[in-house]
From Swiss-Prot:
Molecular function GO terms recorded: flavin adenine dinucleotide binding; monooxygenase activity
InterPro entries attached to this UniProt entry: FAD/NAD-bd_sf (IPR036188)
Gene Ontology CC entries for this record: cytosol; peptidoglycan-based cell wall; plasma membrane
Superkingdom field: Bacteria
Name assigned to this protein: Uncharacterized protein Rv2000
One Pfam family cited in the UniProt record for this chain: NAD_binding_8
Length: 537
């Protein structure tokens, strides 16, 4: 954004505080501009209470001038996006091949959505299998205090951003085979423009890699998707630590972000009676204790995975399956009296679940349509509101359901999850497959995309796809060896160690494949029955 201006955001339009008449505004937009100007002059409020839209390549309203003729550079891979998946892909590519890579990104540092996430966010799953394959994240420690105590550490956002920066500065760039262009906008056809206005044309010898396809979004990236009346304070979670005490907090959204905000407020001694939680859908949650890697937890992990396969094999219907998964401890829910209809891979500890259950004022009336000073209007009706309440918008879709498309397509490659909700592992796996195999048909068979889940039935679809992919991978001894040693592979502990004799490994893997196949066949039957029931309705 140009020096001397602050954009007060509404929708996609920035508003000047100074010289604002230069924008061409509709009457409605002009009215909202005037209201926000009055907020600055008529009522003493903090700038932290006003949604700020900073300029930059993601929302810059001023086109950047091109500085001279376009420059030409050559590379093997042009990677668009330096988020978690882009970094994991590039790391494995550089580690396992002699390829050259050009990385471009809109942000000023690597890390993707982590660079704009709220300051108290942490990983929901262990640091031990997050990041890139070649470098550990964290210190491989067990938390001794807090609501994650007894489990593997969960990296906070600051550590994650520093980690990706270290991967770039200490590992990728020193190879001399990676060129990194931050603050750059991809223009298509191998062209991009930097912040300075320099335009580059990239000659790509192998593939253009789209590491942005899954489009992770956090609340700070966009305004609330519902109408908020003047005078009502509605903020993204990023602003929460900057604000003072309120007599009522209303958390809008029940996904991972909503749970994070509720837990942050409770951790800071806010009385649960002061919290209202707008929960359009209840969710099935993963017990974090069942996803713990390493020798300390290997027996528990194998037993938990086995219990999941047994529950699938014994289930007679969808409801029966979820009952069995809950009994086995695979899945949890906040309210035992409410049947969840959502599944988004959210992960909690038992201590966190106990805290969330302290919140009694839960509104289950669908999504918010608009917020007025004394009323919250939802899909299913309205509820009274406190004029002085602080609303925290947690409705951004951090894992949107994108349609599956071929990962390998001629000179393009589109990063997607090939294991459910394990994006960084998937990106590293795709990079390995890219150089380990020649034929794109074989590569695409190994890298069948798995769209992010949304509803309860998606747990079944995701698990069915996971089982099918895993079976295919285990057919290849070399790929099985790679899976056994990959740091990012959550399921590595299910495989026999590389130190075992080849025949022993083959026998164990073969037995495991049969169990996967049996569970996959049963899931297919349950899904067919559930689909038929849905169509009849």
């Amino acid at each position: 954004m140009r020096p001397g201006f602050v954009g007060l955001g509404f929708g996609q339009w920035p508003v000047y505080v100074v010289r604002w008449p230069k924008l061409h505004l509709t009457p409605r937009q002009r009215k909202r501009v005037l209201h926000r100007r009055r907020l600055l002059t008529d009522r003493p409020i903090s700038l932290s209470q006003i949604p700020i839209r900073t300029g930059g390549p993601m929302n810059d309203p001023w086109p950047r001038p091109t500085q001279g003729p376009a420059k030409t550079i050559e590379t093997d891979y042009l990677v668009i996006g330096a988020g978690a998946m882009g970094m994991a892909f590039t790391d494995t590519l550089i580690t396992e091949s002699g390829a050259r890579v050009v990385m471009i990104d809109r942000a000023c540092q690597p890390g993707g959505h982590w660079t704009t996430a709220y300051p108290f966010v942490r990983l929901h799953q262990p640091s031990a299998y997050y990041g890139v394959n070649s470098r550990a994240l964290g210190n491989n420690t067990i938390d001794l205090v807090g609501w994650n105590q007894g489990l593997n550490e969960l990296a906070p956002v600051g550590e994650i951003c520093a980690y990706f920066d270290a991967v770039l500065q200490q590992q990728l760039l020193p190879t001399g085979r990676v060129d990194y262009f931050p603050m750059s906008e991809y223009l298509g056809d191998g062209r991009f423009r930097t912040l300075a206005g320099t335009e580059y044309v990239v000659t790509v010898n192998r593939r253009i890699v789209d590491a942005t396809y899954l489009r992770a979004v956090v609340p700070s990236m966009r305004p609330a998707p519902y109408s908020v009346a003047p005078g009502v304070d509605c903020v993204a979670p990023n602003e929460l630590p900057k604000l003072g005490t309120r007599d009522r907090y209303v958390v809008v959204g029940a996904g991972k972000t909503g749970m994070d905000v509720c837990l942050w407020l409770l951790r800071n001694d806010v009385c649960p009676d002061k919290l209202t939680w707008i929960m359009p859908r209840d969710s099935w949650l993963i017990d974090r204790a069942t996803l713990q890697p390493g020798p300390t937890f290997v027996r528990q992990f194998r037993e938990s995975y086995g219990a999941t396969l047994e529950a699938i094999g014994a289930a007679t219907s969808t409801d029966d399956l979820f009952d069995r998964l809950e009994t086995a401890g695979t899945l949890l829910r906040i309210d035992p009296s409410v049947r969840p209809s959502m599944y988004r891979c959210a992960t909690v500890s038992h201590l966190e679940l106990e805290q969330l259950r302290r919140i009694r004022d839960i509104v289950r009336m669908g999504h918010v349509q608009r917020i007025e000073p004394t009323t919250i209007v939802l899909d299913g009706g309205s509820v009274p509101a406190t004029p002085t309440a602080l609303y925290i918008d947690c409705t951004a879709d951090g894992a949107p359901q994108r349609p599956a498309k071929p990962v390998f397509d001629a000179d393009h490659l589109t990063l997607q999850a090939v294991r459910g909700c394990q994006q960084v592992f998937s990106a590293a796996f795709i990079a390995h497959v890219e150089f380990a195999y020649e034929d794109d048909a074989v590569k695409n068979e190994l890298c069948t995309p798995i769209p992010h889940p949304d509803c309860d039935l998606d747990w079944m679809r995701l698990m069915h796809s996971d089982l099918g992919n895993f079976q295919r991978w285990l057919n290849d001894p070399d790929l099985t060896d790679w899976l056994s040693s990959a740091r990012l592979n959550l399921l590595a502990d299910l495989l026999p160690p590389l130190s075992h004799k080849p025949r022993v490994r083959e026998r164990v893997v073969s037995m495991f494949q049969k169990r996967l196949g049996t569970a996959g066949d049963q899931l297919a039957k349950l899904l067919d029955a559930a689909t038929a029931t849905t169509e009849q309705r």
